């Protein structure tokens, strides 16, 4: 088994990713996202078997992110582009021990392509895990579980990242715990290999 990640730069890989999410993601079969985005196709011995992607972080952030990173809201906002959210991780088949290999390679490639595409240093990866999952694959890669979201009714679980303070007040929805997510975070170590040559 040789696991590799290749950035989705062509229509074929993008269609593969769209189909993978739509057909195989267990609880959020949506391919839409807001803001920045870089996706990879996951290969096992040169056979495409899944996808993983990162995108813009969340705003406003859950307080657990601020507590873990020791940042104020203003500092987080000023450093917003140094955070990325692992917005999807979806496999078409179960492959033993593949998860940690994929996440390790993501940590190697993500800061390189983030810098290349957006000219920002990537310092933190975060992810939100729901659907009854506890984030075991992330924990096996030494991500820290830093908290949980309060949970919104599923029909109200939408991004309000770009709303003003006034519109946020209008859209306020009482938390219910219905769609609670586990929050995990991984600090990027910038002394990792700085070459993208391993990606094909």
Residue spans for each PLM region:
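Active-site beta-strand termini and strand-to-loop segments that position acidic
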Residues: 42-45, 186-188
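Acyl-donor binding region in acyl/amide transferases
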Residues: 7, 36, 44-47, 54-180
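Short amphipathic alpha-helix that is part of the acyltransferase structural core
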Residues: 1-35, 41, 47
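Conserved beta strand-loop-helix elements of the APE1-like EEP
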Residues: 181-192
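Flexible, glycine-/basic-rich loop-and-beta segments that form/coincide
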Residues: 192-200
């Amino acid at each position: 088994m040789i696991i590799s990640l290749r950035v989705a730069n062509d229509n074929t890989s993008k269609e593969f990713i769209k189909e993978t999410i739509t057909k195989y993601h267990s609880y959020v079969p949506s391919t839409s996202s807001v803001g920045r985005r870089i996706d990879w196709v996951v290969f096992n011995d040169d056979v495409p078997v899944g996808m993983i992607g990162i995108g813009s972080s969340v705003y406003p952030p859950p307080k657990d992110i601020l507590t873990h990173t020791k940042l104020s809201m203003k500092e987080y906002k000023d450093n917003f582009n140094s955070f990325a959210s692992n917005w999807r991780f979806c496999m078409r088949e179960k492959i033993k021990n593949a998860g940690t290999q994929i996440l390790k390679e993501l940590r190697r490639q993500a800061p390189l392509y983030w810098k290349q595409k957006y000219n920002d240093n990537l310092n933190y990866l975060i992810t939100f895990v729901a659907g009854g999952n506890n984030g075991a694959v992330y924990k096996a890669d030494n991500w820290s579980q830093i908290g949980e979201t309060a949970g919104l009714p599923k029909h109200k679980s939408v991004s309000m990242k770009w709303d003003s303070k006034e519109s946020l007040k209008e859209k306020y929805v009482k938390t219910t715990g219905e769609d609670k997510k586990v929050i995990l975070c991984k600090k990027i170590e910038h002394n990792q290999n700085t070459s993208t040559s391993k990606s094909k």
